[in-house]
Structures are given as structure tokens and as C-alpha cells.
Regions:
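Transmembrane beta-strand segments of Gram-negative outer membrane beta-barrel proteins
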Residues: 4-19, 38-57
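Generic alpha-helix structural propensity
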Residues: 10, 25, 29-32, 42, ...
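Short, conserved beta-strand segments within well-ordered enzyme catalytic domains
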Residues: 30-31, 44-50, 88-90, 99-103
Length: 232
């Protein structure tokens, strides 16, 4: 799985998530463009999950250890499965031009783990990064064509990184943290067959605190992780 994820719903898989900022065929649009919630005319709940199966084979590997010369090492591969759930709610306020929404999903994550037998351990090991985005949004329909939307995002992130599992000097990092972001969006409906949407999601710099183990000496530390903004 890559670091930035597109899998905030299941329905967009067949079109590679193209147009997710305006299609609004279910409640998951709250995770893409808050303004497009105005296109939903009744309360709606959407729940889904995506499994990402990563299978990669590496061959013809050349490795230069810190205290040795370049050498060829055995072939290896990756075979990881990552489960990504999501849940969304959209609720139009009857008799008003307002629509409210809430979402729990993930925008960022990766899960890579090499076998302990991999002969280039400082490049192998395990890299696991996970994030949970809990968002609350509102949309206002200005007229039949235009809608505006926005919301706040509470992002919880955790990660585990380990290297050199067979060495006397292993590295292991286990940390987590919370950041606060926001999102803004606009939707424009031309007619029943044409519409446009644009959204911007500000992703904060997340401060992760936890345990850093290096050279068999554990200590508590923190690291600032700048998350990329999203425009679609």
C-alpha cells in the first residue's frame, strides 16, 4: 500500500476514483468534497472496506554493507495485505439549505515487511504507518447551481519502523500522535448530466511521540511528520 490512499470508499474502485469530488452517489462524498453533500436529498449511511494485496518480487539485488564491499544477495519479495475500513454519514436538514456529514476513513498509510532472512537488513525490516481521519463537515446550497462546504479533520496516526532484526544493534521506533486539519469545497451543477467539484484538504504536521530503541538503548522521543495536502 502506498503512503497516500485513495480508498475512502468501495464504489469508486471501478473508475479508479475519478470524479469522487462531485459524483456524490453515496455518503462517502463527505470524505472527498463537503460541498457535494448538497446533492444528496435524504439521510444516508455508507460503510465499506478495501483490502490492498501487495505482491512484489525483487531479483538481481546488489548490496553494499557499511563495512564491506558490494555483493550480490538472494532474491526476495513482499506479500502484504492491508485492510482499510471506512464509514460515512450525510444528513440533510429538512426545510433548510444545510447538510451535515461525518466520516471515519484513512488518507495515509503503508504496510511493508521483509522477511527476517533478507540479506540487506538496513533496507528491509518492517515499515507500518496508519492514520484514522475523523471528520465533521457542513454544506450550504447557495442556489440550484452552487454549493459550498467545509469541515474539520481530527487525524490520529501511528507507526512502527524496525530495521536490522538479526543484528546486535537493532533499530525500532513505535510512536503515535494527533493532528488537526480542515477541508474546503465547492460544487457547481450545470445540468443533470454535467457538474464540477473542487476540494482542498489541509493536512497538518503531526507530532508523533513514542519509544525509539537504537543500539539497545531505549528513549522516549518525538518526531514531526508533515502530511501532504490534497487537492481534487
Amino acid at each position: 500500500a502506498a503512503f497516500q490512499l485513495a480508498e475512502q470508499n468501495v464504489s469508486g474502485l471501478g473508475r479508479a476514483y475519478a470524479g469522487d469530488a462531485i459524483i456524490a452517489d453515496n455518503a462517502s462524498v463527505v470524505a472527498k468534497n463537503a460541498a457535494a453533500m448538497s446533492l444528496i436529498d435524504k439521510p444516508m449511511i455508507s460503510v465499506g472496506a478495501v483490502n490492498i494485496a501487495s505482491q512484489v518480487d525483487f531479483s538481481n539485488i546488489r548490496y553494499t554493507p557499511p563495512s564491506s564491499t558490494t555483493q550480490e544477495i538472494g532474491d526476495t519479495g513482499l506479500d502484504n495485505n492491508t485492510f482499510i475500513p471506512n464509514a460515512h454519514v450525510v444528513y440533510p436538514l429538512e426545510g433548510t439549505d444545510w447538510t451535515l456529514g461525518a466520516t471515519v476513513h484513512s488518507n495515509f498509510g503503508t504496510d511493508v515487511e521483509f522477511e527476517d532472512s533478507f540479506e540487506a537488513p538496513i533496507f528491509g525490516g518492517k515499515t507500518y504507518l496508519s492514520s484514522i481521519n475523523t471528520g465533521f463537515s457542513a454544506a450550504y446550497q447557495l442556489n440550484e447551481a452552487w454549493s459550498l462546504g467545509g469541515g474539520i479533520d481530527i487525524i490520529y496516526g501511528e507507526g512502527e519502523i524496525s530495521r536490522t532484526p538479526n543484528s546486535a544493534n537493532p533499530l525500532r521506533i513505535d510512536a503515535d500522535g494527533i493532528g488537526l486539519g480542515f477541508n474546503l469545497g465547492v460544487a457547481y451543477v450545470v445540468d443533470e448530466n454535467n457538474r464540477f467539484g473542487l476540494s482542498y484538504r489541509y493536512s497538518p504536521e503531526l507530532t508523533a511521540e513514542g519509544d525509539v530503541y537504537a543500539w539497545e538503548q531505549g528513549k522516549t522521543d518525538s518526531v514531526d511528520i508533515p502530511l501532504p495536502d490534497i487537492l481534487e
